[in-house]
């Protein structure tokens, strides 16, 4: 059957380029206005280290393999993609900005808010870095603080606290270059913690306070939400890969054997049932099989996972929102699948913890395709892609001159490739 070009308004494609895997997920809205996942493709990732492209050719090859799989399985041809981006080069800071308005008789409007936010994109950063997201936390009008939406109010001085996110220009451009060399068009770049949040969290969690912990292969992303606003983000430079390497070194086995052991028999906490349980590893080139104690395996995994969760908990505490996380912690990503990790996190943080699966907002018939937390980012990219299209339609109907001029100023910058719909809230 001839392949159909899917570059149309009905279908969204998400591309997740991770340290251990590249995955592509295709979705569309069904007749009930629910997102239906049509298919997915994945390939081993060999050109990415801790979220940063380290080898262009290898990364392109991995993307092409994922493309080939999803196109064959679904008999389609993909073109435009919403691309996830993460990595230890992503940084965040808190900043306060202000503007003084000329006429108090004219009520505060979107133009004033956009002007205030636009000033944040001009912040002086470290050479090679650029501001990619500006997320308002709360506004102050003539000294009156705690305002969530100042539109329609009267006032001269408009201030706001912002959560500002920066990225290395080179790292972002390398991601885009890989996507383009693989024959795809990067429609938008989306920070992966934001995508995972949309796929796994519900409205109550986003509103009442939650910490999303996305454990990938190379890094662990932390994103804190309260009142449906992103309050804090951080990147921990460790993920599931380092656990596998610890097992390899500690047990003197091959890396692929270590990964299989982690998946099949690994645990983040020791339990009595592990006593005297042994696993046999086949020997190489005629060597004798190696006996591995499951208890030893759990001790290795537990030590590293405790280190990662301690770093996560430190970020939660320094954010200032520890006491406000009424719904606790949600774990997702491939690294969250380690047995008993949920219990370890609850023990360390004394907070309710659950595993976040990427089926929170998709049609029931699609859930079997993306049951694993490893697909949270990919599903979230599809969901955010549809949200972006809806917001674009709304903006096209209500554009003002400032928005147009602002877009023109940013068009030559990396900012133009980043979605901006995180900057107000997550809904």
Predicted ranges, named:
Residues 22, 197-198, 208, 217-223, ...:
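Short glycine/serine/threonine-rich phosphate/pyrophosphate-binding segments
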Residues 85-86, 167, 267-269, 324-348:
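Glycine-rich phosphate-binding loops at beta-strand->alpha-helix junctions
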Residues 208-250:
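Glycine-rich phosphate-binding loop of actin/hexokinase-like ATP-binding domains
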Residues 1-21, 25-212, 229-230, 240, ...:
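Nucleotide/phosphate-binding catalytic cleft detector across ATP-hydrolyzing
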Residues 356-402:
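Glycine-rich phosphate-binding/hydrolytic loop that grips phosphoryl groups
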Residues 277, 352-355:
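Flexible glycine/proline-rich, aromatic-decorated loop/lid segments
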Residues 245, 299, 303-310, 314, ...:
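Feature representing long, continuous alpha-helical segments
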